[in-house]
Amino acid sequence: NRNFFFYLGLLFCIACQQGKQVGAQELPKDYTTQHSIALAYCKAHKMNEDFYFLIDLRLHSGKNRFFVYDFKQKKNLYEKLVTHGSCDVFSSNPDKFEKAQYSNQVNSHCSAKGKYKIGKRDYSSWGIKVKYWLEGLEESNSNAQKRLIVLHSWEAVSDSEIYPDYSPLSWGCPAVSNAFMELLDPLLQQSKKPVLLWIL
């Protein structure tokens, strides 16, 4: 009987450990709700109804978290890395690489949640020398233009996942790899309507 209970306890411990390992693995994110909200928003505000950009800064910065979603095909056209802001100007931020902090405050170097309209294409001193101005559409990101928040590329950003390493930090701008920007640029130039970018 003792042996029986010993092996039973051993099996229970192994099962617990396996359960912990499975639970610790990050499950794929389901953005079905966000896609539906985004499409309705684009229709209501006369924005591009073919695709939009979704950035989930809740994910590890070494993993793909910039998604170009095709409304009609109902799938991601691209999944790539993107930076978040250092957010360390007005207070210390020891976890700045591990976790994105949000603020709409000017000069905060933080990322800001919410929906943006991708605006004018302009010259950039970074990456492939192209940037797009971002217009904040919500209270959480209304200072985007005052903060000079733009979508641009940067040589320091990898074009493929680098997890468990982290992507570099920006001053609040969503910066992508040069190769990714070369894909985004023609998409944006060819769009006859403004494109939605949504940061979670």
Predicted regions and their residues:
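Sec-dependent N-terminal signal peptides
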Residues: 4-13
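Cell wall/extracellular polymer interaction/catalysis modules
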Residues: 19-171, 178-195
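C-terminal, well-folded lobe of enzymatic/effector domains
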Residues: 198-199
